[in-house]
Amino acid sequence: MVTRSLADVVRSTDNLAEAFRETDVERGNVHFSVYPDEYTNWIEEQRAWSETCILMDQSYHLANFYIEGPDALTVNADLGIRDFEALRGQRAPQAKTHPIPNPDGYLVGDPVLFYLGEEEVVVTGNRGLGQKWIQYHVETGDYDAEVTDIYSPYGEDPPLEFRFEVQGPNAEAVMAEVFDGPLPDISFFQMTTATIDGHDVYVLGHGMASAPGFEVFGPYEHHDEIKALIHEAGAEHGLRELGGRAYKTTPVATGWLPPGLPAVYDHEDMQGYREWLSADRVEANWSLGGSFESDDITDYYVDLVALGHGRFIDFDHEFVGRDALAERIDDPERRKVTFLWDDEDVVDVFASLFGDGALHKFPKFPDLFQQWDLGHFDRIEIDGDVVGVSMYSCYDVNFRGVLSLGVIDTEYAAEGTEVTLVWGEENSPKRTVESHVEKEIEATVAPAPYVTAREDL
């Protein structure tokens, strides 16, 4: 039996961007299909991360790849902007963000690399986009390493590890009761080990939105026991567990912009990867949406420098995409920003549901778009000219408004710039998109992350 590949999918269509714009998302966002929409209600779950604390069970929606062997660090350094070879001989564990560019410097994926030992790393991230690119190089290149896909949200096997995140003003008080010993003294993105009820766990300092936080992970067999201990300790501190609806809104205030489309579909140096990658993978079944339309698939790619990863690039080592990124590191065409939507214009969208007149695209709160696409691109305009795209939008009760992350031409990236965001997807062939008329929404440019006190990675 011949298995279809991503390359077969690309060859089978004359216009890949159009094909992805016509693709429906089945069962909503698969990452969160294992979670209830709400454990209590999404408004109080949102409030908790700024007023008390939250528990996020990350055991099921992230792809986790173990890479073991003498070249475990080498292959990641060859493909990522960080020189992971520098970790050799250093203490473990450590964690580093791991933005991975294509040969032109556009984002393939942005997982996190956990350094557990000189020949052992775990790469964890969204949909496995960067991890599959790494796996391809390990399997086809001259690397003394082995990749094990220990868990995929698209597979049938249960995870081998649990992963919990506790965030918010009361997170330290909760976790002080959960850890067997003293509260780990680690800052943002530092790691250590600890025990919980006698079980060994890894601990990552992962405060977000100006509040303290911890990420703990270990063998999945202890999932239920440790989760119960966190809930027990959190009861008197206002802890709430996040359901899928509130969870999907967490990236916006903290400034993490997921890939709207992995940059893997066009470059000739990635043809071998496209032939290797199965057509069952999400890359071959992507869904694009929003008011921005282009027939050029590369117009949906996003530059690593525009996303703010430039400060992490180590140009002293060779890696895929190095030359392209070096050319624009000092003069990026676009920058990541937050767009603050005008309240009255948002109310007008809902008001169109009543009375006469055309309907506007219904924004199901709190995450506005993920019911009908995987990568969202709404036009950002000034005087009718497209100057950027809004890519990830939500309502956040902590700000009492709608805000979104996106990228905008550098000359318009200053805080306070007034822009027009075009909301909707007129004449969409998707079954999940109702007939509607696009709506112009006034918006204001703000920093990303919007909660500016967040510490650097």
Task: Outline where the language-model segments fall.
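Acidic, proline/glycine-enriched N-terminal capping motif
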Residues: M1-H98, Y106-V108, K336
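Conserved, structured C-terminal
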Residues: M1-S33, D37, Y115-E120, T124-L457
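A short catalytic or substrate-binding loop motif that flags glycine-/basic-rich loops and adjacent residues
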Residues: D57, P103-G105, Q370-W372
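Internal amphipathic helical hairpin motif
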Residues: P70-L107, P169-V201
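Peripheral, non-cofactor segments flanking catalytic/redox cores
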Residues: D110-V112
